[in-house]
Amino acid sequence: MSSIDPRAIIDPSAKLAEGVEVGPWSIVGPDVEIGEGTVIGPHVVLKGPTRIGKHNRIYQFSSIGEDTPDMKYKGEPTRLVMGDHNVIREGVTIHRGTIQDRSETTLGDHNLIMAYAHIGHDSVIGNHCILVNNTALAGHVHVGDWAILSGYTLVHQYCHIGAHAFSGMGTAIGKDVPAYVTVFGSPAEARSMNFEGLRRRGFSDEVLHALRRAYKIVYRQGLTVEQAMKELDELVAQFPEVELFRQSIANSARGITR
């Protein structure tokens, strides 16, 4: 059974599943759907079209599904879609998409979005990601599974952050970050691979050694991207995990962080 505080404002067209909780002074607008077991704290604003999955927790003063400030936006009915088991901490802002891109901002499952972070329009966040306090993603940003963006990380529009990547505090990212890579600084510079995070996720020493070799091929041998891709082919044949690194470089439209 849902638990709706009498001081909350729920639009009649909103759809709330069983077990949803909505705290005082929160507003759930039209064309919002909230899945089973999701908890909406006090002073939260949810604006549609927005679909929120199961067992999420959204803390106070967050604004989810607001119109994008993109000046091309003219009120089209774009979407925000959030998966399951996400934690959205205090003061987070997540905007809906634009018709110039996917018309949708997407958040996967099991993500932690910490206080005052911002996710811009048309961005795509994978699963098991962490955006630490005050991290800000511009529009059209893609963040791969298990990526961690430390506090005050800034990401330029259209950048792609690869799976398992890591950014240090205050990093300003203007180019794509390949999978597994750790970046620091303003502007961002590649420092290593996220070996500590990979160990915690069960990557074997043999695979870590292969990824270290892959990193050196791309970042330490003075090769062009095309030359590095050819050298990585041999490693990919032995270690499928290297393919994720290789593909994130090969598919980069903005160029990779060096």
UniProtKB/Swiss-Prot annotation:
Keywords per UniProt: Acyltransferase, Cytoplasm, Lipid A biosynthesis, Lipid biosynthesis, Lipid metabolism, Repeat, Transferase
Reactions performed catalytically: a (3R)-hydroxyacyl-[ACP] + UDP-N-acetyl-alpha-D-glucosamine = a UDP-3-O-[(3R)-3-hydroxyacyl]-N-acetyl-alpha-D-glucosamine + holo-[ACP]
InterPro entries attached to this UniProt entry: Acetyltransf_C, Acetyltransf_C_sf, Hexapep, Hexapep_transf_CS, Lipid_A_LpxA, Trimer_LpxA-like_sf
Chief site of localization: cytoplasm
Gene3D superfamilies with a match to the protein in the record: Hexapeptide repeat proteins, Udp N-acetylglucosamine O-acyltransferase, C-terminal domain
Pathway: Glycolipid biosynthesis; lipid IV(A) biosynthesis; lipid IV(A) from (3R)-3-hydroxytetradecanoyl-[acyl-carrier-protein] and UDP-N-acetyl-alpha-D-glucosamine: step 1/6
GO cellular component: cytoplasm; membrane
EC id: 2.3.1.129
UniProt KW Metal-binding keyword: no
Keyword Metal-binding found: no
Location(s) in or outside the cell: Cytoplasm
Domain of life the protein comes from: Bacteria
GO biological process: lipid A biosynthetic process
Family according to the record: Belongs to the transferase hexapeptide repeat family. LpxA subfamily.
UniProt function note: Involved in the biosynthesis of lipid A, a phosphorylated glycolipid that anchors the lipopolysaccharide to the outer membrane of the cell.
Subunit structure: Homotrimer.
Name used for this protein in its record: Acyl-[acyl-carrier-protein]--UDP-N-acetylglucosamine O-acyltransferase
